[in-house]
């Protein structure tokens, strides 16, 4: 049997591409060696958020006296939390399997090896197809630090498939993965230390967002060490000893476990036969604007692509565009606007350009800020301080980017993503009526702040 498209990898990019290809009339096969859903569903986004949601409910129970409620003897059962995590993952994974079957995608289990254009080996069988789409994803990358092979040195994969809770956790890397685990473990009462090599946590995000979260984390008791270069990890009498250099001094932290969250690398090892040269660059696959590799008929999307944004929703959008073009359709997704989120408390989200990026591009940029502490729903829920900062063109008022640190930021950022994609101005955004009292009102207020017309905040 032959197919018009063979998709390698069943993560968000791969299964989305396979389903859309089938919807567009292409005979499609999906090859996945493990469970469908990839890292995101099985060992990433979904299990992390399931645990974070539980930890936040635990925090809220301890703070319930604010609302006139009393809850005595509040505790948590981490094994039970992990059991629910696994139930959530299983439910969503089963849903993906049903969608693949319902859309008549042929699901093939096994490890794929590309033998050449149109030929993929899976076990003893050789599949034939008109086109091949690689959606192989990525895996945790470990830096060359002595001692990272010791028991108790873990990756996010390890933490999200086990059910052991560590009272002392050292985290190497202050990016999104590192900070989400820091927030999770802090909420459950652990001693958390974050070691970030650069000068601030979340270095790819807006500096004000990064600095604000840093202050909040420190206030909650998380030890943050920026500019820290980890030199080695050793087994000590009381746990793992992580030695790091900061400001010409050598310091140590002792922990029950060390999480290495220093980035990810493409899953391309052994993907192709030697005669199939995709021109890999540090393991990543170069592609053109149609996601075509240097080999005709072989395409690639998602984390395995050189320079790609390593986000599940970005991979899914790339997959939709790639197969749409293969089917002779116009690509429907705007890949220039990709929101990113950090699930901490309060939540963080970013989309479009930051003020600094606008200035680097020579844009006459202005910013407006709305403090969410004056939002009615935020006061009702005791959400605390937060803000929304909007970057816009100082001449036209066109919205260029938004940075959010507030309750429900990960939901609110979608409205800004839509506005940026459509080329909307502050006036366009301010024209929309939001229900009251809602967190979403803050979006309109942020736009009004840029116009100098905010109602619930003094205009400056």
What are these model-derived regions, one by one?
Residues 8-13, 17-34, 39, 46, ...:
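Flexible, glycine-rich terminal cap/loop adjacent to redox cofactors
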Residues 1-3, 123-131, 248-257, 294:
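Core beta-strand elements of the Rossmann-like FAD/NAD(P) dinucleotide-binding domain
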Residues 47, 120, 266, 293, ...:
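Hydrophobic "anchor" residues
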Residues 149-167, 252-325:
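FAD-site-proximal beta/loop scaffold in flavoenzymes
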Residues 106-109, 113-121, 188-289, 353, ...:
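A Rossmann-like FAD-binding core segment of flavoenzymes
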Residues 163-205:
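Rossmann-like NAD(P)H-binding beta-loop-alpha module
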Residues 2-3, 19-26, 31-165, 193, ...:
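Glycine-rich flavin
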């Amino acid at each position: 049997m032959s197919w018009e498209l063979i998709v390698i990898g069943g993560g968000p990019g791969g299964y989305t591409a396979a389903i859309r290809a089938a919807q567009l009339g292409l005979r499609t096969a999906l090859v996945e060696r493990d469970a469908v859903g990839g890292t995101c569903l099985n060992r990433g986004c979904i299990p992390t958020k399931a645990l974070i949601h539980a930890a936040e409910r635990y925090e809220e129970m301890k703070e319930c006296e604010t609302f006139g409620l009393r809850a005595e003897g509040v505790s948590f059962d981490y094994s039970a939390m992990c059991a629910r995590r696994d139930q959530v993952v299983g439910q969503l994974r089963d849903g993906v399997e049903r969608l693949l079957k319902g859309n008549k995608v042929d699901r093939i289990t096994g490890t794929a090896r590309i033998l050449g254009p149109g030929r993929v080996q899976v076990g003893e069988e050789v599949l034939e197809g008109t086109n091949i789409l690689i959606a192989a994803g990525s895996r945790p990358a470990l830096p060359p630090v002595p001692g990272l092979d010791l028991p108790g040195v873990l990756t996010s994969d390890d933490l999200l498939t086990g059910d052991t809770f560590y009272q002392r956790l050292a985290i190497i890397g202050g990016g999104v993965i590192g900070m989400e685990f820091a927030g999770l473990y802090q909420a459950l009462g652990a001693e958390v230390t974050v070691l970030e090599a650069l000068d601030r946590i979340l270095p790819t995000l807006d500096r004000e967002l990064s600095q604000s979260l840093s202050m909040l984390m420190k206030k909650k008791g998380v030890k943050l060490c920026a500019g820290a270069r980890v030199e080695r990890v050793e087994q000590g009498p009381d746990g793992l000893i992580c030695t790091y250099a900061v400001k010409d001094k050598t310091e140590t932290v002792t922990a029950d476990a060390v999480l290495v969250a220093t980035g990810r690398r493409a899953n391309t090892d052994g993907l192709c036969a030697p005669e199939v040269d995709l021109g890999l660059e540090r393991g990543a696959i170069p592609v053109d604007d149609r996601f075509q590799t240097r080999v005709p008929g072989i395409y690639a999307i998602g984390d395995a692509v050189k320079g790609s944004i390593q986000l599940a929703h970005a991979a899914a959008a790339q997959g939709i565009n790639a197969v749409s073009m293969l089917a002779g359709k116009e690509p429907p997704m705007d890949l220039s606007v990709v929101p990113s989120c950090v699930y901490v408390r309060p939540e963080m989200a970013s989309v479009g350009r930051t003020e600094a990026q606008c200035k680097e591009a020579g844009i006459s940029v202005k910013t407006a800020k709305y403090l969410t502490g004056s939002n009615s729903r935020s006061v009702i829920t005791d959400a605390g301080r937060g803000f929304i900062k909007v970057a816009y063109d100082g001449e036209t008022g066109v919205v260029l980017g938004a940075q959010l640190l507030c309750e429900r930021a990960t939901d609110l950022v979608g409205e800004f993503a839509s506005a940026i994609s459509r080329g909307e101005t502050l006036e366009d955004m301010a024209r929309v009526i939001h229900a009251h009292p809602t967190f979403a009102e803050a979006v309109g207020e942020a736009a009004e702040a840029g116009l100098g017309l905010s109602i619930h905040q003094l205009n400056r």
